[in-house]
Amino acid sequence: MKTTTLFLAVCFCLVALGCRQDKIDTKAELEKLMQVSRDWSAAASKPDLQKILDYWEDDAVVISAGEPDKKGKEAIKQMVEGSLNNPNFKISWEPISGEISQSGDMGYLLENSKITVSDSSGTEQIMNFKRVTIWKKQKDGSWKNIVDVMSPTTLK
């Protein structure tokens, strides 16, 4: 009887410990995600198509006001190639705030984004955007963007 009771107690403890999920430090994860976004912004200022694309998940969606949605990496690739082929195009952004899910596998960021385009005379037109990015944590611990939404801060 004592052996059975001891065996059941040990089994219960093992099951309880196995079901316990470590608490995610969402603040630390948010800081990591914000740094990933900053790194992505820096990558977007260089003509390295693959490095820029690596931040998106294969089935990501990009939504920009007044433009058709870009669904999937091939459509996003065409958009990025168009930007990289324009020497007068520059984009940058800075994350402002965000949140990480309690499970630590999803997050979103609110960001300020700026696109600068120079015309043939060299005059720069600056467009400011509010941006929402939704991220999914990968099995290897990296973050990939799954939804990217930009909206102009002012309407014409």
In which residue ranges do the predicted regions lie?
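Bacterial Sec-dependent N-terminal signal peptides
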Residues: M1-K27
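Alpha-helix boundary/capping residues
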Residues: C11-C13, D59, S83
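A beta-strand edge to alpha-helix "cap/lid" segment located at domain peripheries
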Residues: C19-D54, V61-K156
